Amino acid sequence: MNVIKISPRGYCYGVVDAMVIAKNAALDKNLPRPIYILGMIVHNKHVTDAFEEDGIYTLDGPNRLDILKQVESGTVIFTAHGVSPEVRQIAEEKGLVAIDATCPDVTKTHELISEKTADGYDIIYIGKKGHPEPEGAVGVAPDKVHLVESEADIEALDLTSDKLLITNQTTMSQWDVHDLMELIKEKYPHVEYHQEICLATQVRQEAVSEQAGQADLTIVVGDPKSNNSNRLAQVSMEIAGTQAYRIGDLSELKLEWLQGVNTVAITAGASTPTPITKEVIRFLENYEPDDESTWKIERSVPLSKILPRVKTKK
């Protein structure tokens, strides 16, 4: 089968940094145990499973504050998605050692919100409800940050401030953000805007929009909780006009999707381990619709190959 390997794809620097921080924590014998991650360090189950083998445990819950209630001692790692100031304060009050793996792009958004709300602004924040990144951003100034995800949310806004600013979750579709920003500007013509789609997200979306149209089908390798992976599939369908499916790994690929397909494009979310994506690429490159010996779908990447290598400090 013809395979278009969309580039760039896969890991971004924020994800790699977060994983290296967590990996170094696992290697640091001086850190108090147990070591917990407040939510998924990045949105990929293969990564969290690999960290568990290294003795770092991922805690889950509806929000970071509730997750933190599960921890009474040891070390906590804040994920790449960021946390609210309240979470940081409670971790400190509990006497926990806190390690911050927040993506620098997310930190920049938090700083923008803090600066503008201190100057009297209300913030209209475009993001996905229930996702940890908006949770942390709203938590910077809960009374001043208004989360919107849809046109209905914008219609429901009732803001009277002369000082309004729009910003957004870093992993949203840039086209969705643009459309929602335009609706907000229609309602509040005096609003200022500061688009915060991170560069890694933007170039990956643009690559799909430009390259997926050459294929009959797009496969996005990424975790179901990965917003940027889901947005890549959306971009393929809505911008490039090519049917797309998101899979967590090779085991989720369906042979019926390949019927009548001559060329498939493949990309991966920013938190998808490279070996997982390479395994899917190898299968598709070897797949022949008339050769049953190429049809076997079997994931074989061991957890030991998932995490980046970190040099041990001497």
Curated annotation (Swiss-Prot):
Organism superkingdom: Bacteria
Its cofactor is:
[4Fe-4S] cluster
Alphabetically ordered keywords of this record: 4Fe-4S, Iron, Iron-sulfur, Isoprene biosynthesis, Metal-binding, Oxidoreductase
Question: Which GO terms of the molecular function aspect are on file?
Answer: 4 iron, 4 sulfur cluster binding; 4-hydroxy-3-methylbut-2-enyl diphosphate reductase activity; metal ion binding
- Record's InterPro entries? LytB/IspH (IPR003451)
CDD domains given for it?
Answer: lytB_ispH
**Which Gene3D superfamilies does the record cross-reference, listed alphabetically?**
3.40.50.11270, 4-hydroxy-3-methylbut-2-enyl diphosphate reductase, catalytic domain
> Which catalytic residues are annotated?
133
Q: Which reaction does it catalyse?
A: isopentenyl diphosphate + 2 oxidized [2Fe-2S]-[ferredoxin] + H2O = (2E)-4-hydroxy-3-methylbut-2-enyl diphosphate + 2 reduced [2Fe-2S]-[ferredoxin] + 2 H(+); dimethylallyl diphosphate + 2 oxidized [2Fe-2S]-[ferredoxin] + H2O = (2E)-4-hydroxy-3-methylbut-2-enyl diphosphate + 2 reduced [2Fe-2S]-[ferredoxin] + 2 H(+)
Residues binding isopentenyl diphosphate: 43, 81, 131, 226, 228, 271
Q: What class of enzyme is it?
A: oxidoreductase
Residues involved in [4Fe-4S] cluster binding:
12, 103, 198
Q: Does the keyword Oxidoreductase apply?
A: yes
Kindly state a single biological-process term from the GO annotations of this entry.
terpenoid biosynthetic process
- Annotated (2E)-4-hydroxy-3-methylbut-2-enyl diphosphate binding lies at 43, 81, 131, 170, 226, 228, 271
Q: In which pathway does it act?
A: Isoprenoid biosynthesis; dimethylallyl diphosphate biosynthesis; dimethylallyl diphosphate from (2E)-4-hydroxy-3-methylbutenyl diphosphate: step 1/1; Isoprenoid biosynthesis; isopentenyl diphosphate biosynthesis via DXP pathway; isopentenyl diphosphate from 1-deoxy-D-xylulose 5-phosphate: step 6/6
Residues that, per the record, bind dimethylallyl diphosphate: 43, 81, 131, 226, 228, 271
Similarity comment: family membership? Belongs to the IspH family.
Function according to Swiss-Prot or TrEMBL: Catalyzes the conversion of 1-hydroxy-2-methyl-2-(E)-butenyl 4-diphosphate (HMBPP) into a mixture of isopentenyl diphosphate (IPP) and dimethylallyl diphosphate (DMAPP). Acts in the terminal step of the DOXP/MEP pathway for isoprenoid precursor biosynthesis.
| Entries under PANTHER family matching the protein | 4-HYDROXY-3-METHYLBUT-2-ENYL DIPHOSPHATE REDUCTASE
- UniProt name for this protein: 4-hydroxy-3-methylbut-2-enyl diphosphate reductase
Organism of provenance: Bacillus pumilus (strain SAFR-032)
Query: Gene name on record?
Result: ispH
